[in-house]
């Protein structure tokens, strides 16, 4: 009987407890905010009272494993597509397409560079909702013939306050309010490059400003009566490594500049050979002990970074803290782009809102999992991607964490355990000596009879 009750309970939980879509009658609303270059351990190294309050009332992921290369454009596009760089096509901040023979720079607004994937703001609009963007990389580009309902073209002179004010206005406007918005802010990346993440005094100043920005966002959402109804994700694209003017690899010390074109550099360099590829490879392979050289086909599978025409024949990857250039000096003391296994390259994630648990902490997730999470919250059907909701759903409320396939496995396991226990009990009973429950009364001759 107990076994039957257990099985029924498991099946009930698997069938009815899991929330596949948000249950609010109104359209779910979501903001994702990226603070560029926010290294995960900044949270433990610097005081951030506003962000602490935000996470106390919501969830925190201590580290987010981002995609390779750990640069701004590839990772911001991965966040909104759930794809690795080789799949969404924005493989670097600067690119050369070997098929079309065209060059991409960060201010390029030609949709052909972005149309290998579909960002969530386009999917949200195609499924009947409204999207807005405050300077997120790529959102000013009309992708797949879809233009955002509300947007701010990138302009670094627009303050954080102005960006937030626009988003709250878009969310609350009486006609065509949006239900999804992205916000991008340049810090602490700019200061991390300039001073390096180990410069405590200077980084403390900029991170204090970042924390004040979080406080401003919270106060504006409360003022607009959005705090309890809008879901907010705060994250970043990458971390930052400490560098030095003494740790610079100059390629022209190893190979003549006429032998190659440097498509993207520092600290991951994309090389297009202009002469014999094998010769260029051999010269670069022996160039410096702190630089690894890969042919395109030899790039490690774990980076998901080889199957695209915008990835060059040779890839140079510097060790953490080293920088690659052609022949000039570099003044910055912090950089990113390195191996995405490095903790220094990882950002964090914090989230708050009706879809999220309160006071919950998780060790790590993959950045490509954030896309299916956002689709789930918005109640839209996401496009094929490299992420999975399974690994991140515990951040959400109303989740029993047991899906139907998992429940079937548990039920089968429970049946096996109960069957084994039953067999053991039967065997033990057979081995026990037989005793009669009531023995016949034995009368001695001197006993008084019970019946006279």
UniProtKB/Swiss-Prot annotation:
Domain of life: Eukaryota
Entry's Gene Ontology cellular component terms: plasma membrane
InterPro entries in the cross-refs: Alkaline_phosphatase_core_sf, Phosphodiest/P_Trfase
Reactions catalysed, as given in the entry: P(1),P(3)-bis(5'-adenosyl) triphosphate + H2O = AMP + ADP + 2 H(+)
GO-annotated molecular function: bis(5'-adenosyl)-triphosphatase activity; metal ion binding
Disulfide bonds: 254-287
Enzyme class: hydrolase
Signal peptide: 1-19
Active-site residues, as the UniProt record annotates them: 72 (amp-threonine intermediate)
Topology term for the membrane: Single-pass type I membrane protein
Positions annotated as glycosylated: 24, 98, 107, 145, 149, 157, 166, 259, 327, 386
Extracellular domain ranges by topology: 20-407
Binding site for substrate: 93, 154, 189
UniProt protein name: Bis(5'-adenosyl)-triphosphatase enpp4
Organism: Xenopus tropicalis (Western clawed frog)
Gene name of the encoded protein: enpp4
């Amino acid at each position: 009987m107990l076994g039957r009750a257990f099985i029924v309970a498991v099946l009930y939980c698997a069938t009815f407890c899991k929330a596949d879509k948000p249950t609010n009658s109104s359209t779910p609303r979501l903001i994702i905010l990226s603070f560029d270059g926010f290294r995960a351990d900044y949270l433990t190294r610097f005081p951030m009272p506003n962000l602490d309050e935000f996470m106390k009332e919501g969830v925190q992921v201590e580290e987010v494993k981002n995609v390779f290369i750990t640069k701004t454009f590839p990772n911001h596009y991965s966040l909104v597509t759930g794809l690795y760089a080789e799949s969404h096509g924005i493989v670097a901040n600067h690119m050369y397409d070997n098929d079309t023979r065209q060059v991409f720079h960060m201010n390029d607004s030609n949709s052909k560079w972005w149309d290998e994937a579909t960002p969530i703001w386009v999917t949200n609009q195609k499924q009947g909702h409204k999207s807005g963007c405050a300077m997120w990389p790529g959102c000013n580009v009309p992708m797949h013939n879809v233009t955002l309902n509300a947007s701010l073209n990138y302009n670094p002179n627009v303050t954080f306050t102005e960006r937030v004010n626009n988003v709250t206005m878009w969310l609350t406007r009486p006609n065509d309010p949006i239900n999804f918005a992205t916000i991008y802010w340049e810090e602490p990346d700019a200061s991390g490059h300039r001073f390096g993440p180990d410069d405590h005094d200077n980084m403390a100043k900029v991170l204090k400003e970042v924390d004040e920005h979080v406080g401003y966002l919270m106060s504006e959402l409360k003022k607009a009566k959005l705090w309890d109804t809008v879901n907010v994700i705060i994250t970043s694209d990458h971390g930052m490594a400490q560098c030095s003017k003494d740790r610079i690899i100059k390629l022209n010390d190893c190979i003549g500049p006429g032998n190659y074109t440097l498509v993207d550099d520092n600290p991951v360099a994309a090389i297009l050979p202009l002469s014999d590829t094998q010769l260029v490879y051999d010269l670069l392979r022996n160039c410096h002990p702190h630089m690894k050289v890969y042919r395109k086909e030899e790039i490690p599978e774990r980076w998901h970074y080889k199957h695209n025409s915008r990835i060059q024949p040779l890839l140079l990857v510097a060790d953490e803290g080293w920088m690659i250039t052609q022949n000039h000096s570099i003044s910055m003391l912090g950089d990113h782009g390195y191996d995405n296994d490095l903790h220094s390259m990882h950002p964090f994630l914090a989230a708050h809102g009706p879809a999220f648990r309160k006071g919950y902490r998780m060790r790590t997730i993959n950045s490509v999992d954030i896309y299916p999470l956002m689709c789930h919250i918005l109640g839209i059907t996401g496009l094929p991607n490299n992420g999975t909701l399974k690994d991140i759903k515990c951040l959400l409320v109303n989740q029993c964490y047991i899906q139907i396939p998992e429940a079937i496995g548990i039920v089968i396991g429970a049946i096996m355990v109960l069957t084994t226990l039953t067999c053991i009990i039967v065997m033990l009973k057979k081995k026990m000596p037989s005793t009669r429950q009531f023995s016949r009364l034995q009368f001695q001759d001197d006993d008084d009879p019970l019946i006279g």
